[in-house]
Amino acid sequence: MRELCGEAVEAARTAGASYADARAVLRRQQTVATKNGRVDALSDIESEGIGVRVLVDGAWGFACDRRLTADGAHDAAARAAAFARASGGGGTRELAPVEPRRATYETSVEIDPFSVPIAEKIDFCLRAEEGLRRAEVKVAEAFVRALREQKVLVTSDGAELEQELVECGGGIDATAVGDGLAQIRSYPSAHGGSSAQAGWEYVLSLGLEREAPRVAEQAAALLQAPECAPGVMDVVIDAEQMQLQVHESVGHPTELDRVLGSEAAYAGTSFLKPVDVGSLRYGSPLMNITADPTTPRGLGTFGFDDEGIPAEPQPIVREGVLVGWIGSREAGFPGSMRADGWSRMPLVRMTNLHLDPGEGSLEELIEGVDDGLYLETNKSWSIDDKRLNFQFGTQVAWEIRDGKLGKLVRDATYTGITPQFWGSLDAVAGLDAWRLQGLTNCGKGQPGQSAHVSHGAAPARFRGVQVGVHA
């Protein structure tokens, strides 16, 4: 594939491109899901192709071809150059410099997930799902997934890079129904479980079968729990919900293409402006956010992004102040360009975006609350197209009274304005409570692309938060 990409780059240069890159990608994705004792979904999909991106007279062009042949490479290069020329740039476009290099990168895997037979995966899901079954649980689900992506990137700057990334993950859901209510509990995370850049050993480490009875019990208990009452109070938010909070209210608004107004699909633009970096107060001094594509097991981990930039940690917020962007070579903040396979051009995407750990334990955070809520596991989210005004719902919550957990509460929500909310942060638990979760459904772009990203966070405490809004 390296020679094929090289041919595509040369063909693009011959067609008038001042810059060109070519990515050849082989991808295999497998999903197994069971529901109420039966196989609910089973897929094993393979795809391959080449994508060519070019600059001609300051305008971008992109084309792809499913043929991993010389004809496919040359045709994609010619079409990409023609598309760029038709865009009528009429100028130049500067890209941040990158050192030419030849290198390889691959995920560390103990058990190849594609070596595990389908029948074994089905049995694994059925056994995990069996622990969810009780009278109140009307829908019991378990699922596992795996992905392998092999890709080669060659650029006219002299980069020749090969990577093999492997992902694996899974989860369980229990939906309890009764008295006109339906309540869901998930593990280890909502909306598709959790995945990591690892092998089948990661799925085994999740303990789905072990956790299933607890998940089902909580789903059933929620049917008898009172609804979260409205009010303003202190909240302690668990690591999993904090990860989505980071994703929606920090990750998307700090994507530099949104800030510059060149991207608005799916998640809107941003309340931030280019001049805000280095001065804008994003949150309290306890807020530290880092983008780190070197995180072990992170779904956003790589050796090089899809522009050939080597992976390295990048500070985004330090002591509550905005200090960096998620960006690209063109925008002057390189290192975060990724494409969803061979048929899409790279976009500015989150890698692994973390809330850095603080000090202390979850129990100590709760002890510091006289009257409040402990919120756990995302259920719903809504945020405006500037990433300012948001509301999140969690699957489960507990009242906090005099520093101790009290009764269970259902349908809990909390609402805020991004900078004010982060400004109310007054504690983040330490490294022992810090958890990494991977999600596979971050949508962006037109045509649409889905990015796989991970977020790390520990439980955090916020003062004076509006809760219990149901609208």
Spans of model-derived segments:
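Active-site bordering "gate/hinge" segments
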Residues: 1-312, 318-321, 404, 440-445, ...
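Dual-mode signal for accessory low-complexity, basic/Gly-rich regions
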Residues: 253, 264-471
